[in-house]
Amino acid sequence: GDLTLFTEEISDLELSKMTNSELRLLRNMIYAKYGHKFNSEDLNQLYSNFNWYNPNKKVSDSQLTKVEFDLVKRITIFETRQETEPSIKFGKEIIGIWHITPIMPSTWLDRFVISSDNKIEFLIDNFQKNPKISEYLGHYEIKGNTLIFYVEKLITKKETIELKEIQLLKFPITPVSEVTLMNGELTRKRIQIGSHEYFLFFGNPRI
């Protein structure tokens, strides 16, 4: 019930740690803070535990800030995770560096590195100054439309941390497709992991 959650950007990494039920509560909390009265009684009862909740109207998307509306859309994407569906099949097309922009600036931004032996890494934007964690390393599997990232190691500026208990990150994922950009001048392989699109690159992901 802490409304300060919404004062800073909530990353895909944070959303990936939450269950679909937790995501539903987080998404609806955005409407609850404006006094939205829900049709679902469990939501009304839950938010009634907080003194800031004053249900007196129906709140529409147009009443949200752009940051709040974008977060609702991103949470909704994560809520599409279905591990019990037939699994998306990937071959060699998933191997490589998946970068969050189709054109790389002067250095790498957020990227996933996926290897042929089911190893996976997530490396944080090089422009970020002193992130607490700069790299997540482990292995992955695909269940339904969900990439399950079993994090085994964390890398900080000072050390590599071997986790005693594996940390699970769960991202919705789409099949690989091809996109043409810049009026046909650039073609990239594209995949959606979490709420963002990533584009295929090769090379050294740590330069």
Residue ranges and their predicted role:
Residues D2-D12, I30, P55-K57:
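Acidic/histidine-rich, surface-exposed loop or edge segments in extracytoplasmic proteins
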Residues R27-Y34, E79-Q82, P102:
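Sec/Tat-exported extracytoplasmic proteins
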Residues G1-I10, R81-I94:
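N-terminal low-complexity, Pro/Thr/Ser-rich intrinsically disordered segments
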Residues L15-E22, V67, F90, K132:
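Extracytoplasmic/periplasmic, Sec-exported soluble proteins
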Residues T84-L137, E141, I148-I207:
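Lipid interaction determinants
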Residues E14-P55:
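Amphipathic alpha-helical packing elements
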Residues I10, M18-L25, E93, E135:
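Short, well-structured alpha-helical interface segments that form or flank functional binding sites
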Residues F38-E83:
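Compact alpha-helical subdomains of small soluble proteins
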